[in-house]
Amino acid sequence: MEQEPKTKALLAAFGCALGYLLAGKLLAALRPVPAAGDRLLSFLYHCAAAPVLEELVFRGAVLRMAGPLGERNAVLLQAVLFAVQHGSPAGMAWALVCGLVLGVLAQRTGRVWPGMLLHTLNNLLVFVAG
């Protein structure tokens, strides 16, 4: 039985986001995120690795996979999935807003690198403030 394109899109988007979340949990168990005391490693993780990987996964893969749902729905879905993997309710709320902005940016430009730069800037500001 052939699935509808929208069902395939939902399953693919959820699968991609779940895979990213599980891979992150596995890596954290094997090698925990650098402690706040190790500023250089923490900086590299939060301001270089995380923004690049998250943009590739959520604005690259998930947004593209969700495309058959329509532009608005695809942006909303990837933003919700992005927010859910950010933990606390406050973190999720801000991540939802960022995910919406970064999703629209990726759709308008057709590229993920502008979002990578904006995401890196956001994380850098949070890192410096924290």
Name the predicted role of every residue range.
Residues 12-20:
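Hydrophobic alpha-helical membrane-embedded or membrane-associated segments
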Residues 19-28, 37-130:
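Transmembrane helix-loop-helix hairpins at the membrane interface
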Residues 1-11, 29-32, 65, 69:
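Membrane-helix interface linkers and caps
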